[in-house]
């Protein structure tokens, strides 16, 4: 062997040895914490993530659920040299999510801030981890979600939900398969665009196809970015280019809409105190529009994607729950009757529908959970956890544990009935505390109006072969597109022709 090759081999071995030593030392602080065996020294638990059987509808949260059941309320997760801790006790959820002392972990939110080199959510309301900067934004944004502002949005909720139902009625022949996931996504984008930004996207009418495709590709990109090696793989170049172009298109749409609003304000036109107005106020005096666009993207994506998936999961589950559907239809008939416009007061009277939507979020939360950074060593449920550790809190995991919910995989809306005990710090589909979702009341009103109108006038049946699993992109969504055949309420088959 030549001296050069020998020197190169020695350098590689030395680098590998140093790498192994670094990984070992980084993990040694956590070895006392319960957790599954590592299938790979360098990769840690990463191979488990790859074997989660997503084709069968299992997602990463199902892996974490298995570990929480087996190893207890504090579980160690190793990926390369990094360690996170899954926490699944109500006491710890209360302690860490309800206190302003514990911030989001910036390392865990980088995948949302920038995707393959393109700024996506940046320093928007969801991904901003500095409490001071976040609080400044949140204080201004809260004005767009006051009770009076939300009540004023009922007109938009009704208008777009009515348009959705009319389109579905035209397809309700009992035979034509309809992707409810796609239709509900179009509806929630149209609602969000008008309610939050004063814009008509007309997705339900087939307009804005480039924007619709860009949103789809961008969401796939967030999922793809979790593969740290993707940007180095030649076969991924086309996909990465499309992801970057989609993000640029989405931010350009934001620039255009912001410019239109600014021009309208200069002309002295009256503008609603909507989300776009508050975004402009929050960044008044800023040197550039980057953070403003961060919040545009944040509200545009988070404001429609989670609601669309919540509705799609609910339709999917109700397709196999005829008794629950009958109760829902009876309630809608009593509260809403035949009127086409739901009033704000109607929403509070749709008690059973509220229970169904809550139970849907328990089993199928689009936003599965959140992270907090533990800055100092702390005893958590009797386990010493070192400082500078990301803590993972999952409403998906806790919502499916029989420790907290009886028969957790059974869809039972009566868990949330008036006389039922309230789940305390085991159910948090909108997170908890000061970092809870700013738009949760908006979302709950929106999905209630849409579901009430669907139940009032449409019967849906899942096409055979559709699976009840999940997939993970930026959020959790149904594995299949929730293909349904539709019929108008009260539809009866035509009588057979008389015999000749």
From Swiss-Prot:
Disruption phenotype: Mutant mice are deficient in spatial, associative and motor learning. Signal peptide: none annotated. The chain crosses the membrane at residues 3-23. It holds the Pfam family p450. Its main location: endoplasmic reticulum. Pathway: Steroid metabolism; cholesterol degradation; Lipid metabolism; C21-steroid hormone metabolism. Keywords: Cell projection, Cholesterol metabolism, Endoplasmic reticulum, Heme, Iron, Lipid metabolism, Membrane, Metal-binding, Microsome, Monooxygenase, Oxidoreductase, Steroid metabolism, Sterol metabolism, Synapse, Transmembrane, Transmembrane helix. It is found in: Endoplasmic reticulum membrane; Microsome membrane; Postsynapse; Presynapse. GO terms for biological process: cholesterol catabolic process; progesterone metabolic process; protein localization to membrane raft; regulation of long-term synaptic potentiation; xenobiotic metabolic process. Expressed in high level in the pyramidal cells of the hippocampus, Purkinje cells of the cerebellum, and neuronal cell bodies in layers II/III, V, and VI of the cortex. Expressed in hippocampal and cerebellar interneurons, in retinal ganglion cells, and in a subset of retinal cells localized to the inner nuclear layer (at protein level). Heme binds at residue 437. It is an enzyme of class 1 (oxidoreductase). Its EC number is 1.14.14.25. Its cofactor is heme. The keyword Nuclease does not apply. GO terms for cellular component: dendrite; endoplasmic reticulum membrane; postsynapse; presynapse. SUPFAM superfamilies: Cytochrome P450. P450 monooxygenase that plays a major role in cholesterol homeostasis in the brain. By promoting constant cholesterol elimination in neurons, may activate the mevalonate pathway and coordinate the synthesis of new cholesterol and nonsterol isoprenoids involved in synaptic activity and learning. Belongs to the cytochrome P450 family. This is Cholesterol 24-hydroxylase.
């Amino acid at each position: 062997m030549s001296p050069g090759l020998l020197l190169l081999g020695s350098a590689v071995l030395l680098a590998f040895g140093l790498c192994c030593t670094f990984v070992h030392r980084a993990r040694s602080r956590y070895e006392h914490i319960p957790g599954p065996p590592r299938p790979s020294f360098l990769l840690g638990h990463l191979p488990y993530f790859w074997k989660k059987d997503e084709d069968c509808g299992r997602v990463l949260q199902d892996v974490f659920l298995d570990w929480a059941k087996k190893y207890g309320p504090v579980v160690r997760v190793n990926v390369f040299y990094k360690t996170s801790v899954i926490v699944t006790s109500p006491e710890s959820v209360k302690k860490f999510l309800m206190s302003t002392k514990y911030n989001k972990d910036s390392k865990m939110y980088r995948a949302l801030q920038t995707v393959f080199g393109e700024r996506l959510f940046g320093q928007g309301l969801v991904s901003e981890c500095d409490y001071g900067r976040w609080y400044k934004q949140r204080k201004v944004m809260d004005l767009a979600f006051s009770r009076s502002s939300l009540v004023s949005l009922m007109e938009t909720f009704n208008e777009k939900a009515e348009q959705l139902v009319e389109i579905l009625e035209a397809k309700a022949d009992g035979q034509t398969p309809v992707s409810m996931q796609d239709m509900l996504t179009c509806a929630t984008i149209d609602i969000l665009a008008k309610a939050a930004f004063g814009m008509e996207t007309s997705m339900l009418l087939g307009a804005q196809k480039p924007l619709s495709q860009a949103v789809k590709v961008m969401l796939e990109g967030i999922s793809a970015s979790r593969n740290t090696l993707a940007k180095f793989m030649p076969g991924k170049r086309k996909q990465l280019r499309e992801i970057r172009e989609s993000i640029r298109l989405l931010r350009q749409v934001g620039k255009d809409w912001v410019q239109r609003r600014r021009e309208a304000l200069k002309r002295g036109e009256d503008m609603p105190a909507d989300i776009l107005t508050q975004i402009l106020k929050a960044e008044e005096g800023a040197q550039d529009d980057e953070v403003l666009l961060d919040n545009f993207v944040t509200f545009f994506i988070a404001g429609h994607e989670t609601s669309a998936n919540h509705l799609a999961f609910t339709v999917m589950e109700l397709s196999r729950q005829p008794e629950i559907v009958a109760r829902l239809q009876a309630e809608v008939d009593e509260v809403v009757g035949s009127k086409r416009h739901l009033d704000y007061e109607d929403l509070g009277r749709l008690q059973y529908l509220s229970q169904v939507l809550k139970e849907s979020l328990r089993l199928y939360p689009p936003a599965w959970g959140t992270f907090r950074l533990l800055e100092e060593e702390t005893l958590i449920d009797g386990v010493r956890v070192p400082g500078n550790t990301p803590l993972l809190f999952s409403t998906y995991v806790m919502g499916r544990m029989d420790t907290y919910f009886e028969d957790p995989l059974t869809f039972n809306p009566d868990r949330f009935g008036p006389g039922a005990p309230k789940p305390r710090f085991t159910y948090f589909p909108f997170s908890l505390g000061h970092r809870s979702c700013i738009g949760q009341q908006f979302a709950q009103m929106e999905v209630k109006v849409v579901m009430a109108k669907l139940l009032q006038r449409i019967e849906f049946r899942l096409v055979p072969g559709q699976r009840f699993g999940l997939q993970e992109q930026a959020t959790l969504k149904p594995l299949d597109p929730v293909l349904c055949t539709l019929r108008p309420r009260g539809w009866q088959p035509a009588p057979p022709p008389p015999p000749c």
